[in-house]
């Protein structure tokens, strides 16, 4: 069985509190890992972006402090600020998880993106598949 490189996306709306950020980031990541049958050893990296109104805790720190169901010390985490877009959704954390997955034929299997807690509005075309 071949390993192919792919990515899966996620987003979650949060309140600007450490508790909300930790709880929601861990929940989103658990769902990404579970729905896509991802193991820590197959993850290349996990990148987050946050809107500029999230100021109390970055999602990588939240994930390290919380419980996402995998050992998150096994792969790099990275955070950056989302571009500020007029009229854009507020209090959003977005994720891009790059990972290897098993593929019998070398094709990339369907990925299950995760949009939670109001972030479904960002990509209704992807959220509907879940």
What are the language-model segments listed below?
Residues 1-130:
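Terminal domain-initiation and capping elements
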């Amino acid at each position: 069985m071949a390993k192919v490189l792919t990515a899966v996306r996620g987003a979650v709306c949060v309140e600007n509190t450490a508790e909300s950020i930790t709880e929601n980031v861990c929940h989103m990541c658990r769902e990404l890992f579970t729905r896509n049958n991802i193991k820590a050893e197959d993850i290349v990296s996990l990148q987050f972006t946050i809107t500029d109104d999230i100021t109390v805790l970055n999602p990588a720190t939240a994930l390290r402090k919380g419980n996402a169901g995998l050992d998150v010390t096994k792969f790099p985490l990275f955070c950056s600020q989302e571009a500020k877009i007029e009229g854009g959704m507020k209090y959003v954390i977005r994720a891009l998880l790059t990972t290897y997955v098993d593929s019998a034929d070398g094709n990339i299997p369907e990925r299950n993106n995760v949009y939670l807690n109001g972030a479904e509005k960002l990509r209704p075309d992807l959220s509907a598949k879940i």
